[in-house]
Regions:
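Class I SAM-dependent methyltransferase Rossmann-like catalytic core
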Residues: 1-58
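Class I SAM-dependent methyltransferase SAM/SAH-binding core
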Residues: 47-124, 129, 144
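Short catalytic micro-motifs in class I SAM-dependent methyltransferases
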Residues: 134-135
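A short glycine-rich, Lys/Arg-flanked "PGG" loop and its adjoining helix->strand segment in the class I
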Residues: 143-158
């Protein structure tokens, strides 16, 4: 048995990739802002798979929502309107972008009805669902990221993720 780690992205390349500013465009027909087309499409297909899962999360997190799919986030929020959502971003710029796009104004009736979105890391062991679309292939240490996600999941919680490779 070997003790070598599987090949992964070079840490310098991962840091450079993470520092890139990801364009956020208008959605279809000039609608809600969207992330990269492929990321939105993969996320849309992942969201469809949630119909097979009977557990309705009370708390869930969207890891790197700006890169992973802003339109998909809206689909998830519609599917789980009563669940508390955490949005986790690794850079201050993307965190602000997520706040700008995903926060409802104080006067919006939807803000009064739904659980508020929190733009911070969730407590360990608190999530019933963790959503990470098209992210794992971008991090320097995928095993450490999966271990971190595992710590945030509650017993019987589940991870929905996609990646290249």
């Amino acid at each position: 048995m070997t003790h070598e780690l599987p090949p992964t992205i070079d840490p310098v390349a991962a840091a450079r990739w993470a520092a890139l500013s990801m364009p956020v465009s208008a959605g279809p027909s000039g609608g809600a802002p969207a992330s990269a087309w492929l990321h939105e499409e993969v996320a849309r297909r992942m969201e469809e798979r949630l119909a097979w899962i009977k557990l309705r999360p009370q708390q869930w997190a969207h890891w790197e929502a700006v890169r992973g799919g802003l339109q998909a986030h809206k689909l998830l929020a519609q599917r789980y309107p009563d669940a508390r959502c955490f949005v986790v971003e690794s850079s201050p710029g993307r965190l602000q972008r997520a706040r700008d796009v995903l926060s409802k104004p104080w006067w919006h009736p939807g803000r009064w009805k739904a659980a508020p979105t929190r733009f911070e890391a969730p407590p360990e062991g608190s999530l019933q669902m963790l959503w990470a679309n098209m992210l794992l292939h971008q991090v320097a240490d995928p095993q450490a990221m999966i271990a971190h996600w595992h710590r945030t999941l509650a017993v019987d919680g589940f991870l929905m993720f996609s990646c290249f490779g």
